[in-house]
Amino acid sequence: MAKKQTAGRDRLGKLAPKFAELNDDVLFGEVWSREEQLSARDRSMITIAALFSAGLYPQLKSHLILGKEHGITKDEAIEIVTQLAFYCGWPKAWSTFPMIAEVYGEE
């Protein structure tokens, strides 16, 4: 079971409280918790791919961290990016590999 998400409220609670509520309670509270349909690890892989393809690097870094918590290894993260580079763009891979190095370190 995923831990309770509070990032929306922590970062946007005063500025956009309804958005923060939807982020924490619906997206992470309801969708991400449906582990019978997809594991948190699989959801992390899908989310990493989606954020990579859109070039949303701040969110991508956050989800690389979350993916690591969900069991995605450094080698798997590298392979995800290598695969996606051919479909989404080589420069995106170059932008993402330093994030992987930062998140995973020398593992």
Where are the regions a protein language model picked out?
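Acidic, glycine/proline-rich low-complexity segments that act as flexible tails and inter-domain linkers
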Residues: M1-R41, I65-E69, A93-E107
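Short acidic alpha-helix initiation/capping motifs at coil-to-helix transition points
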Residues: E21-D25, A54-K61
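Residues at the start of alpha-helices and the adjacent loop-to-helix junctions
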Residues: R41-D42, Q59
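Short, structured motif recognition centered on aromatic/hydrophobic residues
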Residues: D42-L51, I80-V81
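Short alpha-helix boundary/capping elements
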Residues: A50-L56, C88-G89
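Short basic/hydrophobic patches in alpha-helices and adjacent helix-turn junctions
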Residues: F52, L66-H70, Q83-F86
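Mid-chain, well-packed structural core segment of small domains
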Residues: P58-I78
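C-terminal structural segments of small proteins and small subunits
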Residues: I78-A101
